[in-house]
């Protein structure tokens, strides 16, 4: 399970959708999952439920990518990511309550601090062949390649 986390508007969906499509793996977007479950509860319990829901969906496949805010360490723990990508591309979001709640992660595998050019993204991913790798090697290689952008 690969988690792409960060403030709303930081580029989680942009990156997750492209990675999912490129590698033909599921991308679970938290906003879309909330729509499916008609759950827009953003208090502590609602956020915990969303984190657990995202984990269950991500575990349906051997490799999956999920994008959601994960504002607190506990929610990140609930998700149990194999790899975490922190989209640290903005200082604050349009949602003041989320800005106040969000704690930058202490543990992550990759921190992205600038917007990624789409052509550069696809060029760096070009030689990763998911069909010849186990999930751990794929996740490791993905983090290495993205880290070079």
Language-model features: locations:
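Short, structured coil segments at secondary-structure junctions
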Residues: 23, 80-82, 107
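Walker A (P-loop) ATP-phosphate-binding motif of ABC ATPase nucleotide-binding domains
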Residues: 1
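Hydrophobic anchor at the beta1->P-loop junction of P-loop NTPases
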Residues: 4
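Conserved substrate/cofactor phosphate-moiety recognition/catalytic segment
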Residues: 16-57
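The conserved Walker
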Residues: 7-8
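Conserved lysine of the Walker
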Residues: 12
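Glycine-rich phosphate-binding loop used to anchor ATP phosphates in small-molecule kinases
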Residues: 44-95
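Small-molecule kinase domains that catalyze NTP-dependent phosphoryl transfer to phosphate-bearing small molecules
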Residues: 87-149
């Amino acid at each position: 399970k690969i988690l792409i986390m960060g403030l709303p508007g930081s580029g989680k969906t942009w990156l997750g959708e492209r990675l999912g499509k490129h590698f033909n793996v599921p991308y679970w977007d938290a906003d879309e999952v909330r729509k499916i479950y008609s759950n827009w509860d953003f208090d502590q319990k609602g956020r915990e439920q969303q984190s657990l829901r995202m984990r269950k969906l991500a575990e349906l496949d051997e490799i999956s990518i999920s994008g959601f805010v994960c504002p607190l360490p506990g929610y990140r723990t609930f998700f149990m990511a194999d790899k975490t990508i922190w989209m640290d591309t903005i200082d604050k979001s349009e949602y003041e309550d989320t800005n106040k709640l969000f704690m930058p992660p202490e543990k992550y595998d990759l921190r992205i601090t600038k917007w990624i050019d789409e052509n550069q993204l696809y060029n760096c991913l070009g030689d990763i062949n998911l069909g010849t790798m186990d999930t751990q090697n794929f996740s490791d290689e993905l983090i290495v390649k993205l880290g070079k952008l």
